[in-house]
A protein has these predicted regions:
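Extended, low-polarity transmembrane helix blocks
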Residues: 1-132, 139-221
């Protein structure tokens, strides 16, 4: 994999890639503080948000921090989850939609079975992933790996929250995060005004000497 820019990439395209990289980094930076360890913003006893449908309306008993949003995802996991919704005639039900209810239910099983019972240590996993995304993309260090982790985190959030009705979460917020993360992974943004531009030639020399670890790291820059 060459460290040079892809053939035909213009200065404007590089600038756009850097702007996208820094924007996604800052987005994850802003999300670090309301769920900072060691309590992750949760109330005493790490109580999670709960809810039930009453007459077709969802009534939530909300808590705070990461426990709040994990609880919201858990409540909505058992409901129909249409996304990519388009109402062509602006009347009645949408004519175009994709139901991700199966994925939402799997996400609910993951949250209820693993994350919630182990929140006191799994919270560090969630926070650590987002902190790594920020550092990686902001510095342009292992930029492809940062994009890959951002893809995973954005996909989980999209499945868990995109398009829910209470609290209302605009689905394209999450779709846009996922698409931007895919672009960061695909275009290796750390190679332009990032530490990867400095790191890649040094890793290449180590690869020539037979270092498999250097080869792996180089593929993530």
């Amino acid at each position: 994999m060459n460290s040079a820019a892809p053939a035909g990439m213009s200065r404007l395209q590089k600038i756009a890639l850097i702007v996208g990289r820094l924007a996604l980094a800052y987005l994850f930076f802003t999300q670090l503080w309301w769920k900072a360890p060691p309590r992750f913003g949760c109330p005493e006893g790490f109580a999670f948000t709960t809810g039930a449908f009453d007459g077709g309306r969802l009534r939530l008993q909300r808590t705070s921090g990461l426990c709040d949003w994990l609880g919201v995802e858990s409540v909505w996991a058992q409901q129909p989850r249409p996304v990519l919704v388009s109402n062509l005639d602006n009347a009645g039900q949408p004519e175009i939609a994709v139901d991700i209810g199966f994925l939402a239910r799997l996400n609910g099983v993951f949250i209820d079975g693993l994350v919630k019972p182990n929140i006191q240590w799994f919270g560090y996993v969630v926070w650590g992933m987002e902190a790594f995304i920020f550092v990686s993309l902001f510095l342009g260090l292992l930029g492809r790996l940062g994009g890959l982790v951002a893809m995973a985190q954005s996909a989980q959030l999209m499945i868990g929250l995109a398009g829910i009705g209470n609290p209302y979460e605009f689905e394209w917020t999450y779709h846009s995060m996922l698409v931007l993360s895919v672009l960061m992974f695909a275009f290796a943004p750390g190679r332009y005004l990032g530490l990867d531009a400095w790191l890649r030639p040094r890793l290449a020399m180590a690869v020539e000497k037979g270092s498999r670890l250097a080869g792996l790291l180089r593929s993530l820059t």
